[in-house]
């Protein structure tokens, strides 16, 4: 419930004729380490960083008026994007006809998010039914929430969390198994085509 400035940085990849947008904030992302400090202690505000990132990405897409065909979320830092898109932003015309794909990686965070994480989501407008899924705000439950709100899933690492592997066997959604580096580009393109057809 605090205001933090959203900084959008733009870079170009000339050879691909592509622009890349970076979501930034001095308080959340100007650190020497990404998830944990040099002693391996996970940052206490990783929950707020994930919330800020999700809202920042979605608000940037809205501001630039990009109507996506596919929103591909990679890893737990983006896990709230599917939730927000399918709940808070579900009536926004920019997000009218698109698919969400969530890639799951072997990048578990080990500690739980802070105990008031559900309150932060409630403040953002996430309903009580969804908050039940994250009563224990850990990597597995936050990933399950992302899986629930995604249309398709990609296994991005050779091995992933064992509990998520079991959970995926119960999910009735298209799942692309892990692809070797030499094959993943074609496999992803085919998966995107399948999701859009």
Question: Model regions: which residues?
Answer:
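Catalytic cores of nucleotide-sugar-dependent glycosyltransferases that transfer UDP/GDP/TDP-activated
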Residues: 1-197
């Amino acid at each position: 419930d605090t205001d933090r400035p959203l900084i959008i940085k733009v870079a170009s990849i000339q050879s691909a004729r592509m622009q890349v947008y970076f979501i930034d904030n001095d308080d959340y992302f100007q650190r020497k380490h990404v998830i944990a400090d040099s002693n391996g202690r996970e940052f206490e505000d990783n929950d707020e960083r994930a919330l800020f990132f999700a809202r920042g990405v979605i608000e940037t897409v809205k501001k630039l008026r990009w109507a996506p065909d596919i929103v591909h979320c990679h890893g737990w830092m983006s896990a709230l994007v599917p939730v927000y898109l399918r709940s808070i932003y579900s009536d926004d015309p920019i997000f009218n006809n698109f698919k969400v794909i969530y890639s799951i990686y072997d990048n578990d965070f080990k500690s739980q998010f802070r105990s008031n994480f559900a309150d932060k989501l409630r403040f953002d407008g996430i309903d009580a039914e969804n908050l039940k899924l994250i009563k224990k705000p850990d990597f597995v439950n936050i990933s399950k929430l992302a899986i629930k709100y995604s249309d398709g899933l990609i296994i991005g690492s050779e091995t992933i969390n064992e509990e998520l592997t079991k959970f995926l066997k119960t999910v009735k959604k298209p799942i692309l198994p892990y692809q070797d580096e030499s094959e993943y580009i074609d496999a992803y393109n085919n998966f995107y085509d399948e999701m859009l057809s």
